Regions:
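Generic structural signal for well-ordered, non-membrane alpha-helical segments
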Residues: 29, 160, 190-194, 198
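Hydrophobic, well-ordered secondary-structure elements that form the walls
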Residues: 25, 167, 201
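Extended C-terminal subregions enriched in glycine
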Residues: 56-60, 194, 202, 206
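FAD cofactor-binding and catalytic pocket of flavoenzymes
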Residues: 52-191, 221, 225-227
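Glycine-rich loop(s) and the adjacent beta-strand/alpha-helix scaffold that form part
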Residues: 7-82
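Flavin (FAD/FMN) cofactor-binding core of flavoprotein oxidoreductases
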Residues: 208-229
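Feature captures the FAD/FMN-dependent oxidoreductase FAD-binding
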Residues: 1-4
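Non-transmembrane alpha-helical segments in soluble domains
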Residues: 34-38, 198, 202-205
């Protein structure tokens, strides 16, 4: 393979500059680290047809599902109070911490209920069936903001040969570099694992005092989609 001896970048005037270095650290997050190596000619890009190459092979991330618990008006969650990531985590269903007999999957994940300071843009809990905007949405948000708790499931993501990263043969960025292309779908193993975790989280939510309704979302379910970058 090749050895990185520095970094080429564009300065504020758009001029190409080479900065030599004895050590080059990749610190652009996993996806962009892979892209940097690919456009720099470092390593062999994975070819799914032949199975050769390691760069971009077996891309995996995390498998997300969640429960929203809506409480009666006498039960207050006060989402604006907390330390940013204050909460409790159940680790009983992570990895090999539980018996997988007849479950049909390997892996697992943690189940967590936490407070993130009720961030005004990120935290907008409304019951299922609420319109996405308008007066009814505002009314629902006002009524549920202080009577809601979220429970999230962060599950494992098993690597498969069908999930990988490579360079797009068509699309390029403003500087002429090929864009990163992701080929990914949840394997059946992860779908089963996520459904199992979600059932456990929903069970916890239903047994909370004061809960009047719950809703669930499984991002790995068949037909579901979300940004995994």
């Amino acid at each position: 393979g090749k050895t990185a001896t520095g970094v080429t970048y564009l300065d504020a005037q758009g001029r190409e500059v080479f900065q030599p270095a004895d050590v080059v650290c990749l610190g652009a997050y996993a996806l962009w680290n892979v892209q940097l190596m690919m456009v720099s000619g470092l390593g062999q890009i994975y070819d799914p047809a032949t199975g050769e190459g390691t760069l971009g092979r077996n891309y995996s991330y995390q498998t997300i599902a969640a429960v929203s618990a809506y409480f009666d008006e006498d039960t207050w969650s006060n989402p604006f109070i907390g330390a940013g990531a204050l909460g409790m985590t159940v680790d009983d269903y992570n990895g090999d911490n539980f018996d997988h007999t007849d479950l049909g999957f390997v892996g697992g994940g943690y189940i967590s209920a936490n407070q993130t300071n009720g961030r005004p843009i990120n935290y907008q809990p409304v019951p299922p069936g609420t319109p996405g905007w308008g007066a009814e949405w505002k009314r629902a948000l006002r009524d549920t903001y202080q009577h809601h708790v979220g429970i999230v499931c962060h599950g494992s993501s098993m690597s498969t040969r069908a999930n990988y990263l490579d360079l797009d043969p068509t699309w390029r960025d403003a500087y002429g570099q090929p864009l990163m292309r992701m080929t990914f779908d949840f394997p059946e193993n992860d779908r089963r694992m996520s459904a199992f975790l979600l059932d456990r989280a929903a069970e916890i939510a239903r047994n909370m005092d004061g809960v009047r309704e719950i809703s669930t979302v499984n991002r790995a379910a068949e037909g579901a989609a979300y940004s995994i970058v």
